[in-house]
């Protein structure tokens, strides 16, 4: 990635952005950051060993329709954009950065007039996204209510990817399909090839 100081990796939830970005950052000797850590928005609506689903997160997914969930998350990403842009500008002339997150919306990234940057979006077939989200949410052991929340998150994630792919294909940035069985190393190689 000659000359590139910031590699941005976008994509919907559970496409492997964090894992691939971590591997890529290690390979390049760059810092790895996630846009998810810049501000809070109702995230994944399933229990983990460390936490229960907060009431406001459950309410968010229970009460909003899929299009409203999309509008909500895109509005959140729009509010977050100035911080993302500042981070990209700072690292474009300084220490290298691999920045990943769903907040890297193609239409906003396309407006960046910052040298030494590259952007790639990860995509996956709906079956892959579904399997990964259901595995993360322990769907098979979940209650009916927990499955409902996971299904809403899945529907939002699939819709997000559909809109994102339309934007990426229209604007021309690169995208990499993570496939069903591609290794992290293979996806990282493909991202590097697209970012060069």
Predicted regions and their residues:
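ATP-dependent small-molecule kinase phosphotransfer cores
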Residues: 41-96, 103
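P-loop (Walker A) phosphate-binding loop of NTP-binding proteins
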Residues: 12
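Short beta-strand-centered segment that lines the nucleotide-binding/catalytic pocket of NTP-utilizing
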Residues: 28-46
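NTP-dependent small-molecule kinase module
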Residues: 162-196
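Conserved lysine of the Walker
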Residues: 17
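Hydrophobic anchor at the beta1->P-loop junction of P-loop NTPases
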Residues: 9
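A glycine- and Lys/Arg-enriched "phosphate-lid" helix/loop adjacent to the NTP-binding pocket
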Residues: 116-161
């Amino acid at each position: 990635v000659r000359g590139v100081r910031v590699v941005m990796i976008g994509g919907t939830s559970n496409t492997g952005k964090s894992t691939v970005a971590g591997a890529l950052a290690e390979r390049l000797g760059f810092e790895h950051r996630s846009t998810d850590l810049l501000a809070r928005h109702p995230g994944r609506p399933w229990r983990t060993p460390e936490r229960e689903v907060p009431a406001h997160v459950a309410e968010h997914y229970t009460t909003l329709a899929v299009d409203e969930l999309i509008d909500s998350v895109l509005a959140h990403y729009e509010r977050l954009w100035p911080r993302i842009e500042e981070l990209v500008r700072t690292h474009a002339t300084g220490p290298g950065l691999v920045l990943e997150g769903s907040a890297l919306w193609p239409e906003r990234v396309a407006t960046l007039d910052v040298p030494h940057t590259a952007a790639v979006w990860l995509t996956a077939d709906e079956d892959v996204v579904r399997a990964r989200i259901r595995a993360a949410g322990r769907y098979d052991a979940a209650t009916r209510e927990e499955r409902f929340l996971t299904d809403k998150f899945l529907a939002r994630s699939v819709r997000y990817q559909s809109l994102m792919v339309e934007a990426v294909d229209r604007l021309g940035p690169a995208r990499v399909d993570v496939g069903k069985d591609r290794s992290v190393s293979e996806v990282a190689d493909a991202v590097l090839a697209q970012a060069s």
